[in-house]
A protein has these predicted regions:
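Conserved histidines in hydrophobic membrane contexts and catalytic metal-binding motifs
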Residues: 28
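Short hydrophobic/aromatic beta-strand micro-patches
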Residues: 46-48
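Catalytic core of pol beta-like nucleotidyltransferases
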Residues: 1-25, 33-39, 50-96
Length: 96
């Protein structure tokens, strides 16, 4: 799957993600965003929740996205993003 296909699927399910998991916004980053992903690559997604990133929200969203996209998801919250990686991720991130 390329980045356009993934973004299209995520956009189609955005309302459900907001309703179920109280997502503020999602961004695609990493090898998939750069269209350099291999068949066994995970999909890197940066998420911001409205409110706390509870275990229920975080893991619920991760499992939902894995089922939806059929690939492992590396889900990173904006608050947990390491400061030294932030500029690189923000530069390549594609907002859903």
């Amino acid at each position: 799957m390329n980045s356009n296909e993934i973004l299209q699927i995520l956009r189609q399910h955005k309302a459900e993600l907001i309703k179920r998991y109280d997502v503020n916004h999602l961004s695609l980053f990493g090898s998939t965003a750069r269209n350099q992903a291999r068949a066994n690559s995970d999909i890197d997604i940066l998420v911001s929740f409205n409110g706390a990133a509870t275990s229920s929200r975080y893991f619920g969203l991760q499992f939902y996205l894995e089922d939806l996209l059929g690939h492992p998801i590396d889900l990173v919250t904006e608050k947990a993003l390491r400061i030294e990686l932030r500029p690189y991720i923000e530069q390549e991130a594609i907002r859903v």
